[in-house]
From Swiss-Prot:
UniProt protein name: Probable inosine/xanthosine triphosphatase
Cofactor(s) needed for function: Mg(2+); Mn(2+)
Key words, A-Z: Hydrolase, Magnesium, Manganese, Metal-binding, Nucleotide metabolism, Nucleotide-binding
Top class in the EC scheme: hydrolase
Catalytic reactions on record: XTP + H2O = XDP + phosphate + H(+); ITP + H2O = IDP + phosphate + H(+)
PANTHER family per record: NON-CANONICAL PURINE NTP PHOSPHATASE_PRRC1 DOMAIN-CONTAINING PROTEIN (PTHR34699:SF2), PTHR34699
Organism (species): Pyrobaculum islandicum (strain DSM 4184 / JCM 9189 / GEO3)
Length: 177
């Protein structure tokens, strides 16, 4: 199956490939540019989810022979009086169905929080602080914070896996599409 992904980030592309493979689905991943209307640092759960959905629909519209369009969006949400970075994946299909999934979330480091809430991308702040180039295309800030135990790939893959759950044939009776 051809799967269009609204990103050129290798972490996201590999995560989509791996998530589909986990369920025995053969996916030919086709990267496309993300929509220009997306904010650099989405804040709020609805904004993050909307960004993932917009990416998924845009990818599907660009690649005419794709069965699925996938959007992966990382952003910040508030819970329990804290701010968390979360990854959300959305999968759109030709029937207009969109499924979503969340990856694990981690607390945004306090030293970055004010800038993040002003719209500065967490990855940019992490690159400056840790002196690493293109951190979001590599291990991500989570990779640095966990000393490589968890990577951005892991967060992306988990979100895509969760978005695939309603699409598994064994789960068809459980969902109304």
């Amino acid at each position: 199956m051809i799967v269009a992904v609204a990103s050129r980030n290798p972490n996201k592309l590999r995560a989509v490939q791996a998530a589909y493979k986990l369920f025995g689905m053969r996916a030919q991943v086709v990267p496309v540019e993300k929509p220009v209307s997306l904010p650099p640092q989405p804040i709020g759960v609805e904004t993050v989810v909307a960004g993932a959905i917009e990416r998924a629909r845009a990818a599907l519209s660009v690649v005419q022979n794709a069965e699925h369009g996938v959007g992966i969006e990382a952003g910040v949400l508030q819970a329990g009086g804290r701010y968390l970075d979360v990854t959300v994946a959305a999968i759109a299909d030709r029937n207009g169905v969109v499924t979503i999934g969340f990856g694990p979330a981690f607390q945004v480091p306090d030293i970055f929080l004010n800038d993040v809430l002003r719209g500065v991308e967490l990855g940019v702040l992490a690159e400056r602080y840790f002196g690493r180039v293109a951190i979001g295309y590599k291990e991500g800030i989570i990779g640095v914070l966990t000393k490589g135990v968890v990577s951005r790939f892991d967060l992306n893959m988990a979100a895509v896996v969760m978005a695939l759950v309603p699409r598994l044939s064994t789960n068809a009776p459980l969902y109304r599409f």
